[in-house]
Swiss-Prot record:
PROSITE patterns: GATB. This is Aspartyl/glutamyl-tRNA(Asn/Gln) amidotransferase subunit B. Keywords: ATP-binding, Ligase, Nucleotide-binding, Protein biosynthesis. Heterotrimer of A, B and C subunits. It catalyses: L-glutamyl-tRNA(Gln) + L-glutamine + ATP + H2O = L-glutaminyl-tRNA(Gln) + L-glutamate + ADP + phosphate + H(+); L-aspartyl-tRNA(Asn) + L-glutamine + ATP + H2O = L-asparaginyl-tRNA(Asn) + L-glutamate + ADP + phosphate + 2 H(+). Allows the formation of correctly charged Asn-tRNA(Asn) or Gln-tRNA(Gln) through the transamidation of misacylated Asp-tRNA(Asn) or Glu-tRNA(Gln) in organisms which lack either or both of asparaginyl-tRNA or glutaminyl-tRNA synthetases. The reaction takes place in the presence of glutamine and ATP through an activated phospho-Asp-tRNA(Asn) or phospho-Glu-tRNA(Gln). Its EC number is 6.3.5.-. GO terms for biological process: glutaminyl-tRNAGln biosynthesis via transamidation; translation. Belongs to the GatB/GatE family. GatB subfamily. It is an enzyme of class 6 (ligase).
């Protein structure tokens, strides 16, 4: 029997507001534990919540960017549960009247475009954070009350690979809107995954398992891959899948049972009595709509249709707003479009990955990168020299030409000097000369390599090719 995988994702996004959802406390990451709190966050008796209008605007902006319908009337509800980092013993969320419904995003997997539906987007407050140490636990309520939006996909995802693509696209769109940093490492983006299997052709969904502790997109994919295999083996062996919440163990790559899954009835939702419903008229919706910036799909189309970039380049460059903005600024400084794209996808990304830094944390600027690319364009600097210059440019900033000169990397373009390298290579590699004369094209490449090696990569490659052909034709 063959099974179809059905996946739905619940993504929590922390909104980048100055204050919390229902209190004036700061909502900033990284403060001393329990320093960003007040009587509302600590649930003192008699205190009343006040809705953060900026958070509502940003929830609407995100929903619009995800092609959602904005509710005319939306309300808050109490989700009741007890946990030490939830001092009220309930969370203010939205149950049956979310702010946004019926959206979608388009993803690309293996060269094909697929539309993934989004059921709803609702607002809620975050809980605090518990840290467990041995026999005791520490509670930090700085995060308590931070504004969140939860984005719930339709069960349209059919593979862990599609889930990864959905998360990448969702993160990209939200980042472009400016409503969140969407940094998983800081907790401003978190994901729970629901997965079930059903026989191909069956309409009824199988029993789902919810996966938690998915701290990176890669872990989401790995957790789903493991769970897909676990459920298939269980079903093929005649077993049944229970409705469970499971935790992904990063060290083993397996999912581990946490508890039997609760349903919404277990939370005893009821309308929040201390907050009146939101009435969102067309004028309010239009004001928010006017604030939506250019989104990744629009930029991607512009890069292909107006700048002439391949679709792959456009996709990679628009994955993050940071990279896309940097690209646009670099070409505004006069750098060649395709060379800039190649450097950002190649040398720049390699440097960032190797040093585990973000682009904006380096000393690289669009201006100094454009300066280096223009030196490559006009033949002053070879690509090989550029690779030696770039790490210092990214680490210390400055001017690429000056770095090249300070490190004795100036490209050799003097013909007399280059002829010495050329003739030395020909004298030392007579067999390659014969191979060239016999029509073996690889011989030319080998000889160029020998010359570049002898000149320590400083020979002007265009001039080397010209002089080498000239000298070969004489022999």
């Amino acid at each position: 029997m063959h099974f179809e995988t059905v996946i739905g994702l619940e993504v929590h996004v922390e909104l980048k507001t100055d204050s919390k959802m229902f209190s004036p406390s700061p909502a900033h990451f990284g403060a001393e534990p329990n320093s960003n709190t007040n009587v509302i966050d600590l649930a003192y008796p008699g205190v009343l919540p006040v809705v953060n209008k900026r958070a509502v605007d940003w929830a609407m902006r995100a929903a619009m960017a995800l092609n959602m319908e904005i509710a005319t009337e939306s309300k808050f509800d109490r989700k009741n549960y007890f946990y030490p980092d939830n001092p009220k013993a309930y969370q203010i969320s939205q149950f049956d009247q979310p702010i946004g419904e019926n959206g979608y995003i388009d993803i690309e997997v293996d060269g094909e475009t697929k539309r993934i539906g989004i059921t709803r987007l609702h607002m809620e407050e975050d809980a605090g954070k518990s840290t467990h140490k041995g026999e005791y636990s520490l509670v930090d309520l700085n995060r308590q009350g931070t504004p969140l939006i939860e984005i719930v996909s339709e069960p349209d995802i059919r593979s862990p690979k599609e889930a990864y693509a959905y998360l990448e696209k969702l993160r990209s769109i939200i980042q472009y809107t400016g409503v969140s940093d969407v940094k998983m490492e800081e907790g401003s983006l978190r994901c729970d995954a629901n997965i079930s299997l059903r026989p191909y052709g069956q309409e009824k969904f199988g029993t789902k398992a919810e996966l938690k502790n998915l701290n990176s997109f890669n872990y989401v994919r790995k957790g789903l891959e493991y769970e897909e295999k676990r459920q298939e083996e269980e079903l093929l062996n005649g077993g049944e899948i229970g409705q469970e919440t499971r935790r992904f163990d990063e060290s083993t790559g397996k999912t581990i049972l946490m508890r039997v899954k609760e349903g919404s009835d277990d939370y005893r939702y009821f309308p929040e009595p201390d907050i009146v419903p939101l009435y969102i008229d067309d004028a309010w919706k239009e004001r928010v709509r006017q604030t939506i910036p250019e989104l990744p799909d629009e930029r991607k189309a512009k890069y292909v249709n107006e700048l002439g970039l391949p679709a792959y380049d456009a996709h990679v460059l628009t994955l993050t707003k940071e990279m896309s903005d940097f690209f646009e600024s670099t070409i505004e400084h006069g750098a060649d479009v395709k060379l800039t794209s190649n450097w950002l996808m190649g040398g720049v990304n390699e440097y960032l990955n190797k040093n585990q830094v973000e682009l904006l944390d380096t000393k690289l600027t669009p201006e100094n990168l454009a300066g280096m690319i223009k030196l490559i364009e006009d033949g002053t600097m070879s690509s090989k020299i550029a690779k030696k210059v770039f790490p210092e440019l990214a680490a210390k900033g400055g001017n690429a030409k000056q770095i090249m000169e300070d490190n004795g990397l100036v490209q050799i373009s003097d013909e007399a000097t280059l002829l010495k390298f050329v003739n030395e290579a020909l004298d030392n590699n007579e067999q390659s000369v014969e191979d060239y004369k016999n029509g073996k094209g690889k011989a030319m490449g080998f000889l160029v390599g020998q010359i570049m090696k002898a000149s320590k990569g400083q020979a002007n490659p265009q001039l080397v090719n010209q002089l080498l052909k000239q000298e070969l034709d004489k022999r």
